[in-house]
């Protein structure tokens, strides 16, 4: 009798994706983040579903409905804390996943990489509209500041902003539609994840060495299922520690005050995972220029495959490129720090220098380093 998992139409897909999938034998823990992102997405969809059962998307009751969830709903406080901190874990895994892709040259699988960038943008959009829902001070003013950037677009900007708002400012209509967006987008993300995996399984995973691993592959199960299970347990340990011991450490204290359109918070800033992009936005003293730089800071990922000049795929044996990669990492951390600081000296100039170096590292220095390493590897005799 033939095995059901190899013959049944549905089981066959699962079998080829998670059981009999040939995987390179040398992929390190950096390849765990894909599965961890899948776990994060499932946690967010489940906790979000239970929150949506008790939340009301009305300006008069949104804030108190979140308080009601935390006070009166069975384990509502836990569901809310898991959802809020789950978003932070999601972005932490996303940034590490993208960083791994850049370091080991995974971006050369262009279709997988491009779908990944679209996924990143969709997750960022979902997190942004989700942050507006509790209708606290930072929710309201964050929504006002970021949606108002649309008005920088020539000719159609103001009309576009008012169309998104559903009125002349961020109000009841905005909150209702943001809740609708926040509910539907995770399912769009789930569909994109399937497409992402489809393209990935067409080529197979890359590996740390960057050379063709076809001669040495092992089945995904049990080797990588057990490895992913360990990663999953560590992720849950960190998430539960955050949610149970210091659930508000990554949030903004201003969001414990209900939204008040008549009082602006002293420092408007988004959640920590958007601070690097927010710092780039603020570093340009022109509205349209800032918006374009903000978009470019993420969309630049799309051109990375075309900037690859090295003969070797991975940075594993390329010390100059490695150095530049870690400088880029430090640069992004600097931008994250600057994004949370007030707009005054010396933070303004540090932010501007960090923004310029962010783009220069990716567009100029890293491609040049690849070419230089090719030259250094050529025999000189």
Swiss-Prot record:
Compartments, as annotated in UniProt: Mitochondrion inner membrane
Entry keyword Transmembrane: yes
Pfam families: Cytochrom_B_C (PF00032), Cytochrome_B (PF00033)
Biological-process GO terms, alphabetical: mitochondrial electron transport, ubiquinol to cytochrome c
Membrane topology: Multi-pass membrane protein
InterPro entries from the UniProt entry: Cyt_b/b6_C (IPR005798), Cyt_b/b6_C_sf (IPR036150), Cyt_b/b6_N (IPR005797), Cytb/b6-like_sf (IPR027387), Cytochrome_b (IPR030689), Cytochrome_b_C_euk/bac (IPR048260), Cytochrome_b_N_euk/bac (IPR048259), Di-haem_cyt_TM (IPR016174)
Glycoprotein in keyword set: no
Binding site for heme b b562: 83, 182
GO cellular component term of the entry, any: mitochondrial inner membrane
Domain of life: Eukaryota
Membrane-crossing segments per the record: 33-53, 77-98, 113-133, 178-198, 226-246, 288-308, 320-340, 347-367
GO molecular function: metal ion binding; ubiquinol-cytochrome-c reductase activity
Residues the entry annotates as binding heme b b566: 97, 196
Cofactor(s), names only, from the UniProt record: heme b
Keywords in alphabetical order: Electron transport, Heme, Iron, Membrane, Metal-binding, Mitochondrion, Mitochondrion inner membrane, Respiratory chain, Transmembrane, Transmembrane helix, Transport, Ubiquinone
Residues where a ubiquinone binds: 201
Textual note on the cofactor: Binds 2 heme b groups non-covalently.
Gene3D superfamilies: Cytochrome Bc1 Complex, Chain C
Bridged cysteine pairs (disulfide): none
CDD domains linked: cytochrome_b_C (cd00290), Cytochrome_b_N (cd00284)
Note: Heme 1 (or BL or b562) is low-potential and absorbs at about 562 nm, and heme 2 (or BH or b566) is high-potential and absorbs at about 566 nm.
Role noted for this protein: Component of the ubiquinol-cytochrome c reductase complex (complex III or cytochrome b-c1 complex) that is part of the mitochondrial respiratory chain. The b-c1 complex mediates electron transfer from ubiquinol to cytochrome c. Contributes to the generation of a proton gradient across the mitochondrial membrane that is then used for ATP synthesis.
PANTHER family per record: CYTOCHROME B
Assembly: The cytochrome bc1 complex contains 11 subunits: 3 respiratory subunits (MT-CYB, CYC1 and UQCRFS1), 2 core proteins (UQCRC1 and UQCRC2) and 6 low-molecular weight proteins (UQCRH/QCR6, UQCRB/QCR7, UQCRQ/QCR8, UQCR10/QCR9, UQCR11/QCR10 and a cleavage product of UQCRFS1). This cytochrome bc1 complex then forms a dimer.
Family: Belongs to the cytochrome b family.
Designated name of the protein: Cytochrome b
Organism: Sminthopsis crassicaudata
Gene from which this protein is expressed: MT-CYB
């Amino acid at each position: 009798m033939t095995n059901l998992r190899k013959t049944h139409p549905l089981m066959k897909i699962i079998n080829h994706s998670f059981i009999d999938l040939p995987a390179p034998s040398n992929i390190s823990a950096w390849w765990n983040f894909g599965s961890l992102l899948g776990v994060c997405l499932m946690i967010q969809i489940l906790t979000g579903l239970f929150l949506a059962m008790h939340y009301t998307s009305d300006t008069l009751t949104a804030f108190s409905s979140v308080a009601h969830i935390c006070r009166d709903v069975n384990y509502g406080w836990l569901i809310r804390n898991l959802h809020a901190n789950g978003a932070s874990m999601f972005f932490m895994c996303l940034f590490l996943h993208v960083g791994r892709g850049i370091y080991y040259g995974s971006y050369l699988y262009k279709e997988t990489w491009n779908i990944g960038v679209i996924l990143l943008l969709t997750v960022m959009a979902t997190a942004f509209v989700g942050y507006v829902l509790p209708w606290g001070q930072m929710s309201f003013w964050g929504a006002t500041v970021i949606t108002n950037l649309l008005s920088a677009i020539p000719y159609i900007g103001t009309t576009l902003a008012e169309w998104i708002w559903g009125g002349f400012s961020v109000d009841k209509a905005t909150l209702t539609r943001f809740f609708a967006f926040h509910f539907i987008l995770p399912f769009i993300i789930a569909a994109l994840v399937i497409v992402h995996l489809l393209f990935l399984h067409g080529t197979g995973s890359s590996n740390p060495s960057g050379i063709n691993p076809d001669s040495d592959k092992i089945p995904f199960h049990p080797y990588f299922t057990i490895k992913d299970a360990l990663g999953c347990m560590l992720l849950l340990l960190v998430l539960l520690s955050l949610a149970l011991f210091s659930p508000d450490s990554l949030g903004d204290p201003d969001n414990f005050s209900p939204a008040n359109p008549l009082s602006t918070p002293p420092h408007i800033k988004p959640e920590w995972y958007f601070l690097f992009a927010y710092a780039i936005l603020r570093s340009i003293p022109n509205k349209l220029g800032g918006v374009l730089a903000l978009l470019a800071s993420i969309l630049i990922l799309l051109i990375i495959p075309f900037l690859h000049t090295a003969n070797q795929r991975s940075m594993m044996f390329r010390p100059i490129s490695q150095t530049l990669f870690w400088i880029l990492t430090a640069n992004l951390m600097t931008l994250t720090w600057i994004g949370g600081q007030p707009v005054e000296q010396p933070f303004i100039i540090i932010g501007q220098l960090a923004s310029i170096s962010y783009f220069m590292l990716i567009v100029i220095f890293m491609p040049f380093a690849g070419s230089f390493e090719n030259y250094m590897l050529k025999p000189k005799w």
